[in-house]
């Protein structure tokens, strides 16, 4: 019974290429599957695959036109507009003004004098550094008679001062006393001993008792009881294999009844006293 394919042509080609790549990697470790196939095709006399045809008429790429020259915004010199033989807007100097397009020394002097005349300048040209929103600088004129210095606790109003009979600049407070000499540091005063310890003996050191609740990182060495089903099963299997009785602790030395016992050794000592 025919069934529709589950993969399209692109997926089939991908799987085929992957199978070829993996089969090459299975027996060769050069890492270049395509180069290896081309080398084998050359050695075995297989002609190389034809190259795809090139386009004989490539598309023509048109170049962008050059940008126009920027407009000239330079202002003409004052007095260069002539009406005798000048241009359309009077921008060039005519022949009737006394020149062939060039400025004479007299014209330059007139232009400099006109630019330096304060009457012909605009307010912005007269004060180039002044801004519209600039604040006006505060200027304080120095008075001829200085205001007398007042005491910090004295009122600044003459009516509130009341009994101020002195002249200007007089203070109601008494003059400051001269600075005293630097005081010397007092002698050290030794504190008396405490009445609880008149002899001056050192107090006994504190007693540090051993810790009761000990916490070990590893289990302390000692007898370890055999507990659990798996532990007893391993113990009985070992006893059956070695023909010995079971133990109750892992640290117990196993006893083997079938092994010959060691002969008793008798030691005689001729010493009268035992230490």
Curated annotation (Swiss-Prot):
Taxonomy-wise, where does this protein's organism fall, top ranks first?
Viruses, Viruses incertae sedis, Anelloviridae, Alphatorquevirus, Alphatorquevirus homin3
- SS bond list: none
Q: Where is the composition biased (Basic residues)?
A: 129-139
- Protein name per the record: ORF2/4 protein
Query: Where is there biased composition of kind Gly residues?
Result: 79-98
Q: Which InterPro entries match?
A: HEV_TT_vir_Orf2/Gyrovir_Vp2_N (IPR004118)
Annotated segments matching region Disordered: 44-103, 116-207
Which spans does this entry mark as compositional bias, Low complexity? 170-188
């Amino acid at each position: 019974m025919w069934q529709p394919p589950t993969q399209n042509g692109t997926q089939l080609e991908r799987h085929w290429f992957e199978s070829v790549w993996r089969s090459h990697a299975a027996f060769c470790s050069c890492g270049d599957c395509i180069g290896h196939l081309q080398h084998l095709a050359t050695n075995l006399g297989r002609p190389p695959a034809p190259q795809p045809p090139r386009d004989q008429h490539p598309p023509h790429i048109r170049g962008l036109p050059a940008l126009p020259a920027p407009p000239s915004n330079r202002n003409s010199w004052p007095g260069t507009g002539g009406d005798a033989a000048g241009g359309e807007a009077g921008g060039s100097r005519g022949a009737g003004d006394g020149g062939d397009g060039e400025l004479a020394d007299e014209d330059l002097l007139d232009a400099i004098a006109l630019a330096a005349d304060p009457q012909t300048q605009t307010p912005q040209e007269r004060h180039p550094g002044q801004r519209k929103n600039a604040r006006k600088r505060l200027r304080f004129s120095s008075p001829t008679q200085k205001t007398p210095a007042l005491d910090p606790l004295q009122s600044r109003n003459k009516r509130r001062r009341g009994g101020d009979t002195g002249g200007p600049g007089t203070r109601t407070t008494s003059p400051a006393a001269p600075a005293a000499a630097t005081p010397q540091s007092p002698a050290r005063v030794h504190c008396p001993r405490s009445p609880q310890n008149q002899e001056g003996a050192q107090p006994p050191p504190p007693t540090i008792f051993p810790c009761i609740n000990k916490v070990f990182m590893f289990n302390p060495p000692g007898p370890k009881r055999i507990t659990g089903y798996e532990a007893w099963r391993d113990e009985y299997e070992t006893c059956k294999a070695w023909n010995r009785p079971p133990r109750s602790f892992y640290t117990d030395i196993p006893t083997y009844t079938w092994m010959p016992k060691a002969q008793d050794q008798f030691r005689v000592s001729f010493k009268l006293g035992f230490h």
